[in-house]
């Protein structure tokens, strides 16, 4: 069972809120978020309500300040628990919108999109199996984008403001 605890102040101090399911609007429960304790499951946290804005992927552990989860500020307004998955992984990335241009299929992590794909930009994507995280920079750094099974015809469909993706990886069963 997944559970995350949000704290208004750093180092797990101040008002807090416990959550064990998806929540589209956390604003009634706390005004800011400066530390988080993930007691179970994998979670995607969003800067804005309704699963919008910056996204942060967190696994079990303690995050005493927002920089520990690569946060840009102390604002968390929605969250999603990522279902545990034990199957195979498969995803196709495309160099153009609407699944156009060069395509590559992946079943494993990719620490550098450019080294593998020879492009820095991914304009569309089809996730067939598993849950994935896109990262803005190589080596799993920078802004993060949660990718669940489905078709993403343009980069804004996964919440990005530009098509640059530096790396991606699978959300593995062992992370839970």
Swiss-Prot record:
Signal peptide: none annotated. Residues 84-88 are annotated as: Connecting peptide. Keywords: Eye lens protein, Repeat. GO terms for molecular function: structural constituent of eye lens. GO terms for biological process: lens development in camera-type eye; visual perception. It holds the Pfam family Crystall. SUPFAM superfamilies: gamma-Crystallin-like. InterPro entries: Beta/Gamma-Crystallin, Beta/gamma_crystallin, G_crystallin-like. Residues 2-40, 41-83, 89-129, 130-172 form the Beta/gamma crystallin 'Greek key' domain. Monomer. Crystallins are the dominant structural components of the vertebrate eye lens. Belongs to the beta/gamma-crystallin family. Has a two-domain beta-structure, folded into four very similar Greek key motifs. This is Gamma-crystallin M2. The lineage of its organism: Eukaryota, Metazoa, Chordata, Craniata, Vertebrata.
